[in-house]
């Protein structure tokens, strides 16, 4: 039926009601060649369809009902079962003989080799699953003690190297509470002090790993920049010059040589001390610097008083 609307010609086709009746009395060839009949991939007559007999790709389709080719899987050559991958016979994109089990995940046409977690956790005390208990013991990880009567496993013992030593117990005292100290500093000192506190928190959270050397070099560059700006802004003699000179000399020397957390701790404390010298009379961290920055005071003979030998 043809309808016209202006210059547009519309062709309308009506399907006869007789095509909706059962076609079981027809031959398979008649059902495939009849108009209006569609053969879907995976159906018994799909491979024998006249249009698909010469297509080698469809000749390999299985006859399992409900078989579905995931779209998009043919485009990724690095996936299992993709074209060009050794050991992948059959349809490109179909799982090969060494493909993972059926519990893989298919999302949006992508193949993910991830598997579901096992229902039961392995026994760490069995010989087969002993590797599950070989994880490195962290700061907050409790050491699992084997039950009474079980053989002692060396891999369950805590590594004595992970024990914090007495020398490392007082490292990195600058934490998140130190950020409240920013309002007491001049505006041109706050960015540097904030960087010092953030690096201190990062190193305290990763005390089991060596400190990154690039961080020490970055602190040295930042310290030299703010110290140069402070010198230009204070052309006249300032009583802070000796102390800030001692601090910046130590920072410049230590920054490129950071190897241990003790080095990083001393560098950070010297940087924070440099910042807080601007309000030395009211600084609430004066006691902290008196504990961790004695080496700076000793540089100018202001360390512990020398003991006078008795006269008799």
UniProtKB/Swiss-Prot annotation:
Keywords annotated in UniProt: Host nucleus, Metal-binding, Phosphoprotein, Virion, Virion tegument, Zinc, Zinc-finger
Region: Disordered, residue numbers: 20-106, 143-170
GO molecular function, one term: zinc ion binding
Pfam families referenced in this protein's UniProt entry, alphabetically: Gene66
Biased composition (Basic and acidic residues): 46-62
Family: Belongs to the herpesviridae US10 family.
Name of protein: Virion protein US10
Organism: Human herpesvirus 1 (strain 17)
Lineage of origin: Viruses, Duplodnaviria, Heunggongvirae, Peploviricota, Herviviricetes
Gene: US10
């Amino acid at each position: 039926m043809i309808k016209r609307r202006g210059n547009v010609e519309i062709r309308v086709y009506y399907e006869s009601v007789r095509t909706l009746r059962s076609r079981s009395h027809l031959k398979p060839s008649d059902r495939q060649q009849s108009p209006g009949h569609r053969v879907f991939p995976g159906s018994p007559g799909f491979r024998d369809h006249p249009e698909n007999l010469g297509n080698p790709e469809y000749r390999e389709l299985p006859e399992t009902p409900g078989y579905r080719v995931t779209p998009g899987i043919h485009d990724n050559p690095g996936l299992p079962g993709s074209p060009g991958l050794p050991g992948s016979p059959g349809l490109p994109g179909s799982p090969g003989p060494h493909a993972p089990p059926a519990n893989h995940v298919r999302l949006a046409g992508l193949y993910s080799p991830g598997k579901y977690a096992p229902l039961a956790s392995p026994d760490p005390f069995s010989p087969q699953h002993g590797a599950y208990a070989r994880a490195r013991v962290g700061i907050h990880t409790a050491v699992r003690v084997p039950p009474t009567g079980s053989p002692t496993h060396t891999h369950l013992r805590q590594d004595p190297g992970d024990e914090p030593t007495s020398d490392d117990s007082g490292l990195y005292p600058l934490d998140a509470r130190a950020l409240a100290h920013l309002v007491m500093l001049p505006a041109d000192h706050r960015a540097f002090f904030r960087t010092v506190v953030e690096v201190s928190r990062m190193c305290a959270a990763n005390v089991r790993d060596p400190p990154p050397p690039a961080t020490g070099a970055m602190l040295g560059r930042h310290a030299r920049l703010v110290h140069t700006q402070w010198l230009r802004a204070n052309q006249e003699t300032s009583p802070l010059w000796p102390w800030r000179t001692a601090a910046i000399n130590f920072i410049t020397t230590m920054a490129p040589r950071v190897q241990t957390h003790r080095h990083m701790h001393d560098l950070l404390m010297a940087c924070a001390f440099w910042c807080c010298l601007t309000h030395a009379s009211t600084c609430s961290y004066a006691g902290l610097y008196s504990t961790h920055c004695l080496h700076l005071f000793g540089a100018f003979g202001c360390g512990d008083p020398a003991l006078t030998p008795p006269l008799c």
